[in-house]
Structure formats: C-alpha cells, structure tokens
Amino acid sequence: MKQFPAIPSDIPHGDMPGDQVCIDDGHIRKAVVIYPRLRELMGEGAGRQVIAVCGGSGVGKSEIASILAYWLNREGVGTRVVSGDNYPRRIPRDNDLERLRVYRQGGLRGLVDRGLVTPEITARLRALWEEDRDAEPSSSADEEAWLAVYRRAGRRALTGYLGTPAEIDFDEVSGILARFHRGDDLFLRRMGREPSALWYDRAACAGTEALILEWTHGNSDYLEGVDIPILLNSTPAETLAHRRARNRDGTTDSAFTAMVLEIEQKKLEAQAHKARIILSKQGEILTWPEYRRLMADA
C-alpha cells in the first residue's frame, strides 16, 4: 500500500460498550509506521491470524487498532477488532473495589505478620481508609514506620491480583482466539458498567482473516493464541505526563491509582520480549536491545 487511505470520522472500532475512540494525527502517524511491518509479519504466517495491540494507559490501543483494521479491510483482508476489556470477572466499579480490597487485606496481613496491630494503628488506618490516603507516604516518621510495612504488603497482594486469572477470564479469551483460528463462529462478550449490562453477540468468522485484540493484557503469559503481539510502549514518566495532561486541573492520579499503573507497567515490561513489534511513544519501532536501554534509563 503506497498511499494510506484517509481515516473517516465514523471509523468502525472495538466492541466495548460505551467505548469512545478519538483518532488524532498522532495515532495515524504511529499506525503508518506499524502497518508495513505488520503486513510483512502477516505474510510470514498462514491461515487466520490474531494480532494483539497492547500497552499501558493512554498509549492509543483502541485508536491504533481501529486504524490498522480499517486499512486491512481496505486491502481486502477481512478484519475484526475485539476488546479484551469485556473479559474481567467483575464490572469496572466492582473490580475497582476488589482491587482496593485486595490491597487493604494484604496490607493488614502484613501488619499482623509483623506484630504491628494495635488499637491506635487500627484507628489511624481506618481514618486513612475513609480519606483514601492509605497508599500515600506519611509525613510522620512514627506513622511511616508501620505504614511502609502496610504499603509493601498491600502492593505485593495487589501484584498477585492485577492482570492474573483472579481478575480476568483469560481462558475465555484464549477460547475465542482458538475458535477464530478454527473458523468457528465466535460468541463475544459485552460488559457494560452495570450488573445488568452483560450479554453475548454471535459473530461469524466467514470472510474474516485477521482478528485484532486491543487490550492491555494482549501479550500476557496467561493468554494463548496470539500470533503477532504489538507493544505500544510508554515509559513511566511518559504515562504520568499523559495522565496529568488529561486531567483538566493538571493534578496527578491518587497514590493508589498510580500504584496500579506502576504494577501494570512492570508486567508489560516483563512480557515485552515476546512482542513482534515494539513502538515507542515517539512513534519509532524499537529493537529489543533499544527497548531494554530505553526502559533502563527511564
């Protein structure tokens, strides 16, 4: 494809209910870089192929996946975009609460294991919970001594939950990818933000040669069936700058949200060696050694 088709305003996108895809010039420039290499890799394979577009918060997974699918369809390669965000075990609100519960339960167990539970600490911790400040360092040296133990234990527990089968039904996603490879009809889950907003749509595979899975966890070790993982990389500093710019008042995330993002970033880094394409935040394809150097300096 010598010239890339213009992107219409009503471009089809993923299947997450209520998802908003806002494509800008930056997304298009990155897709232009990815697309030729993607076509090369697809040419090396045979049969139906699954492409995963993964990365952390704010890297443009949904937008870039939509552009790649649009161009593939224009070239006659029938392509469908599927969002992995439909497959957590809980709706977003309940999953946020479960993340917090796991963190706090883990933190409490850490205090118990160290023999640090007292009525005074229990009362202070309850106050911090009510203020959503238990993931923040304390300005009091005495308080920080036990709060640091709580945070470390909570973070350890949260790491064991985020992006694991406890949080996400990876088996269902892997099953969908297996059905796609076989050419069977797909039953795709739809999850909204309320308990009643849950259903399945049937999708025929006839005429579909590529499936693009756009998802933070698209390169996870728990997932099977991905042929071409694409990592849209972002360093921790770049992620922080993006989220700060997105907040109208320029504030940063809460300490707990920042912790969640840091843990997800570490997991993405641990899985990055499997990516067939790694794209930097600046829109450059990175080799594995270049990626390692970039993240080491981050």
Give the ranges of each region predicted by the language model.
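A glycine- and Lys/Arg-enriched "phosphate-lid" helix/loop adjacent to the NTP-binding pocket
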Residues: V102-Q105, R156-L162, L223-L268, L294-D297
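NTP-dependent small-molecule kinase module
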Residues: K2-E44, I228-L231, A241-D249, Q265-A298
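Post-Walker A helix-loop "phosphate-sensing" segment adjacent to the P-loop in P-loop NTPases
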Residues: Y70-R80
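Conserved lysine of the Walker
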Residues: K61
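Conserved nucleotide-sensing/catalytic segment adjacent to the nucleotide-binding pocket
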Residues: T79-R80, Y87-P195
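ATP-dependent NMP and nucleoside kinases share a basic, alpha-helical "lid"
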Residues: D142, W146, L198-R246
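Hydrophobic positions on the alpha1 helix immediately C-terminal to the Walker A/P-loop
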Residues: I64, L68
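Walker A (P-loop) phosphate-binding loop of P-loop NTPases
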Residues: G58
